[in-house]
Amino acid sequence: MKYATGTDNAMTSGISGQTNNSNSASNEMQPTTSTPTAAHKEATSTATTTATYANGNPNSNANPSQSQPSNALFCEQVTTVTNLFEKWNDCERTVVMYALLKRLRYPSLKFLQYSIDSNLTQNLGTSQTNLSSVVIDINANNPVYLQNLLNAYKTFQPCDLLDAMSSSSSDKDSMPCYGSDFQITTSAQCDERKLYARKEDILHEVLNMLPLLKPGNEEAKLIYLTLIPVAVKDTMQQIVPTELVQQIFSYLLIHPAITSEDRRSLNIWLRHLEDHIQAAAAGLTNRSYFLQPSPQLVAGGSSTGSGSCSSSATSSSTASCSSVASSSLCPASGSRSSRTNDWQTIAPPSKQLQNKLAGDWRGNGGGSSSGSINPLCDNLNGITLNELASSQNSLGLSLEGSSSLVNGVVAGAGSMLGIAGGDDHDTSFSKNGTEILDFDPVTADMGEACSLASSSLCGRNGGNPVEDRSQPPPNLQQQLLQPPPYASILMGNVGDQFGEINRWSLDSKIAALKTRRSNSLTTQTISSCSSSSNSSVITVNDNCSNSTENLAQFANKPRSFSLSIEHQRGALMNSGSDTRLDEFKPNYIKFHTRNVGMSGIGLWLKSLRLHKYIELFKNMTYEEMLLITEDFLQSVGVTKGASHKLALCIDKLKERANILNRVEQELLSGQMELSTAVEELTNIVLTPMKPLESPGPPEENIGLRFLKVIDIVTNTLQQDPYAVQDDETLGVLMWILDRSIHNEAFMNHASQLKDLKFKLSKMKISMVPKMHHVKPAGVGPNNGNINKPRWNGKTRKCDTKNGSNDRINNRKNSNDMLNFSLNCLPHPLPHHSQQAPPPLPQFDYNGYGGGPSHQPQYKSSSYPSFMGNPQQQPPPPPSSKSHHHPQQMQQMLQQHNHFPALPQQTPPQSHRRSLNNLILVAGGPQQPQQLIFKPGQGVLTNNGSNDNLVLERNQQSQQQQQQRKLSGGVSSAEQQPKKTMAAVVMENLAKFDQHFTLF
């Protein structure tokens, strides 16, 4: 709790002339115990002493006598802060307490939650104004009441204001009625409600009710937001005080009910308000915005952060300022037009086109003042003007006039939120489910000091806060030039994006925070984290507690690639499970700065694995960054290795112009390959660069040279037919274009880069993909041929069914063993090279028996396949399956002793398109045919002699008689079907003899 000293006296003297703010909205919102009692003072003093002894002096245990000076120092600081706190109004106190709460750890937050609950219970039980507090709470969330209040504000014209200020009581009865602080609005009670004579009273009531808005009440929130455009216009017409609108902005920007899209839309109107305040402070309220501002403002546009630089993102925004000026010259017409300007005119970009934002504010603009307004100033992540003033003041620069009195309390709330105008503001670096916004809150310290001073000025003016608005007191300027030491403690830039309901409601439990893996033992501490709808948001903060009890810690220190930002191309092309994949996500580090060319410093440091030193560059300009030396880095506490690496990388930044010039010349002359040029672009795209339009010599314009090289590379890829179109090179080039689109230097050329990226993506899609998994030659049954394999003589199917390795002859009848005459039956056949198989118990028409099916080989399509699955074949006749017994078949083999001995392993030859595996055709086409049944095959003789037929019949009869003798007990009923089947088959074959064709 020991704070830095050295400028305490400056702050004390700066605010010595300030008094308590007396223009608060209503006294019922003030706590009843605002003045500490004696008991409270004693308890605070005891707690202060205890805290000082515990944490005030790190070396307190070494020397007990040193605790007294530390105790006195802390007590003085607490007294100073308390005195300042009492001088602030309710809105300032709320913003300060909100900022302090976000710096506490979880146990401290729970303690404060219990204390707040207890205090609320006691105050509601003992306070005399508890009824009014409850009524205000109800009205703040009642859409009907708020709508009536808004309608009354819109219908109250400036002419009505003048009439109301001079009207009698009878005239007031005819005025429209709207809500009060003490009762709920109903149509029957309109006459009993308090009558507001001015719009200021309505804004005071809104200011009282806005903090009581409950998250989730979308209807009430929409009414509050609808009031903002009308109130800003009235402020510019000097109808209502500026300080009231600023305080309303402050509540809205930190309210948990306001989403990120609503806050982004509020930023548009906030910038218009900043423009008006800056112009009023410079004495330009009644002048056209197209006129040249004073020389002080022109000088401050680039060095001290003038209002025109803060609010002019594009020429259309500048033109809108002209419209604002013209409306301020015609108050009546401007107020009448504000009736139709509701919240839909500032809808988020996702709901409405950007060129239609702000309604009639952009209707009269046709040009821009390029001499006084830098269109690039507002493109650097949309930082408010007050943050620019703070960064320049921290560098010791002076501010002209009262240009620091820009935002009031709004600067404190807006800088805490890190408001951005672009659509990519919510994009943050995500790693392991944790969003990280890497920037330091100290950049907004001066902004909060300005807001405190502005609000104190409002308090001193009392009932007339508009007067002396353009001329601040001299002591206040000195106070702004010397920010207090506790400014960084009270009003840190916490930078969260408060998006959803109950973000930091103390009535609900703090959401569980996600932790992330760390590869380093040295980590930075962070501020307390707020829960989000998607993930936790972590904000780097050097001023927070150094306790190890923080639930999440930022910034590991992983391994370093090299001394430059050269990356492996494979890491840019391929995907995997490495946690470095999302490090190249654009805008993952929200480094908010107004220094031109430095917004991308966080991305560059992250690529170097040196992002923990991002705080060194928060207030540096681009030129100062290039002048950093290794000795300077070591003098500010950077380690030796990191300082050496960073110094080498900064030296390489100075060589970028020469490298790009060399690459351009070699590409034009054809001496460099495209892949080498793309590699050089990869090393430069993440480095900080000034915008192309920045003043300076052309040889130092890195962005312009970078775009020239990209143009040469892309034209070569698209037009040169001899260029090597590599898929990998195209992918890396598209990655470079994606990074360039989000780079500050090419922000005005983003559309051209997107078109170029689209063309390259189409080219990449049209490229022939690489053939993967190519089978080498000579491998596999097809010898590496990826086409359909064809049948040939070398790969003819073998009869593996019956265990034979001999190939089946598919072109002729291969049954040589069965081609014999019955004349030679009594004698062995000497020319047989193949012999019949042993008898099988079961067999079918295809000769495969009951064995497993064979997968058909690739065969010529001109022949049908008979080798399919057995399920697809017709069932065999029952005579061939059920009436052959093993004993009978053995006797038949013994009787036909003219057959040679058959080995067990020799299978019969089969033809895939004939029936020769079942029968052997005997005799010519004119001879009758008959079947001779054998165990496993039938034979048709091929002899023209009638003796063969007679001999065959005698042989059949002898065979049947022998079977009867051997069977013995077999009945004639069992044998009769076999004779009948044989006779039927012979008769049928004899009749259809002429239809058989021998092959």
UniProtKB/Swiss-Prot annotation:
The record's annotation in InterPro entries points to: ARM-type_fold (IPR016024), PHAT_dom (IPR015327), PHAT_dom_sf (IPR037093), SAM (IPR001660), SAM/pointed_sf (IPR013761), SMAUG/VTS1_RNA-bind (IPR050897), Smaug_SAM (IPR037634)
Q: Describe the effect of N658D.
A: No effect on RNA-binding
Modification sites for Phosphoserine:
S564, S575, S972
**Top-level taxon in the UniProt lineage:** Eukaryota
What are the entry keywords?
A: Cytoplasm, Developmental protein, Phosphoprotein, Repressor, RNA-binding, Translation regulation
Which tissues is it found in, per the record?
Answer: At syncytial blastoderm, it is located throughout the bulk cytoplasm and pole plasm. By the time of cellularization, it concentrates at the posterior pole.
Asked if the record carries the keyword Signal, the reply is: no
> Tell me, which GO biological process terms does this entry list?
establishment of RNA localization; negative regulation of germ cell proliferation; negative regulation of oskar mRNA translation; negative regulation of translation; nuclear-transcribed mRNA poly(A) tail shortening; piRNA-mediated gene silencing by mRNA destabilization; pole plasm assembly; positive regulation of nuclear-transcribed mRNA poly(A) tail shortening
- Assembly and interactions? Interacts with oskar (osk). Binds to the 3'-UTR of nanos (nos). Interacts with cup, which in turn recruits eIF4-E, leading to an indirect interaction between smg and eIF4-E that prevents mRNA translation. Forms a complex with aub, twin, AGO3, nanos mRNA and piRNAs that targets the nanos 3'-untranslated region, in early embryos.
What's the protein name?
Protein Smaug
